[in-house]
Amino acid sequence: MDAFKTHLAIVASGAPLSREQARAAFDDLLSGEVTPIQAGAFLTALSVRGESEDEIVGAVSAMRARMLPVAAPEGAIDIVGTGGDHSGSYNVSTLAAILTAACGVPVAKHGNRAATSRSGAADVLAALGVKIGLPPEALARCLSEAGLCFMFAQTHHGAMRHVAPVRTELPFRTIFNMLGPLSNPAGVTAQVFGVSRPAWAEPLTRVLATLGSRRVWTVHGSDGLDEITTTGPTAVVALENGAFRHFTLDPREVGLPLATLDDLRGGDPEHNAAALGAVLEGTRNAYRDIAVLNAGAGLVVAGAAGSLAEGVARAQEAIDSGAARGTLARLVAVSNA
């Protein structure tokens, strides 16, 4: 572990690691051969100084090399966020993924249990009856038959167990909070990617581009949500055709009313599952509005809608026609088969 000590000394000095050095350092971290003290010191020093783009690229490369992959159809996307916005909101990206899949775009959703909220994607899907922690073959079947799968991070990133105790002991977020969302096991190249810190938006979009993504909307709500929000404007950094573009979205521009954070506040997995089911049954409320907005973005990123307004309209129709309800029912059935 002399090489890791060298990398630790570089980070502790305040200097950045090269992409190759970061890849090597995270290979060591994920191998389980680094002591807890060394791992804690390394992650703390990185967090205090702030991670460079090359360090994130190297770290994600190490994560992806060790993950359990899933075969996904061409054109599959993910709708995911870094979490950590402490909003306690409904499971927006989960419902948006269901709506997007109901519109014919395969969604390889990657997520975990709750970190800073009461209900993560894994929690609410389990409450809805979806079997969690499936092997790659079963997930490929979900994608083929339901157009949607849920890849449980703990199943696909087993090497994370080596750093989990250290992360639990540290009273702050580390680079690993962004590595999971950047390491989709299905290798999707189109994403709606929510960030809880506005400073992350541009660098993480560039990281995704470096790692092979072709079309990305990285979003941060003005209220702090790691989603496209309906309480006000959302800042977007878009990767399209190799170019980067910055713009702001307002839900009123696509016919959706403004909401408050209280309107979007959820509860435990059972509460959120009931709310999600109610939307699929036709309930019109703030949860529906924010979900169709994010699904609309997913359709744009997938190339299945020419504008956000068109994407939102298609997501609305997926609910009203019962298609979205059918997508969830198929996912529940196939995942438990």
UniProtKB/Swiss-Prot annotation:
5-phospho-alpha-D-ribose 1-diphosphate binds at residues 81, 84-85, 89, 91-94, 109-117, 121. The lineage of its organism: Bacteria, Pseudomonadati, Pseudomonadota, Alphaproteobacteria, Hyphomicrobiales. Keywords: Amino-acid biosynthesis, Aromatic amino acid biosynthesis, Glycosyltransferase, Magnesium, Metal-binding, Transferase, Tryptophan biosynthesis. Catalyzes the transfer of the phosphoribosyl group of 5-phosphorylribose-1-pyrophosphate (PRPP) to anthranilate to yield N-(5'-phosphoribosyl)-anthranilate (PRA). It comes from the Bacteria. Belongs to the anthranilate phosphoribosyltransferase family. Homodimer. Anthranilate 1 binds at G81, N112. It catalyses: N-(5-phospho-beta-D-ribosyl)anthranilate + diphosphate = 5-phospho-alpha-D-ribose 1-diphosphate + anthranilate. Binds 2 magnesium ions per monomer. Its EC number is 2.4.2.18. Its cofactor is Mg(2+). One of its GO terms (cellular component) is cytosol. One of its GO terms (molecular function) is magnesium ion binding. Pathway: Amino-acid biosynthesis; L-tryptophan biosynthesis; L-tryptophan from chorismate: step 2/5. The keyword Metal-binding applies. InterPro entries: Anthranilate_Pribosyl_Tfrase, Glycosyl_Trfase_fam3, Glycosyl_Trfase_fam3_N_dom, Glycosyl_Trfase_fam3_N_dom_sf, Nuc_phospho_transferase. This is Anthranilate phosphoribosyltransferase. Coiled coil: none annotated. One of its GO terms (biological process) is L-tryptophan biosynthetic process. PANTHER family: ANTHRANILATE PHOSPHORIBOSYLTRANSFERASE.
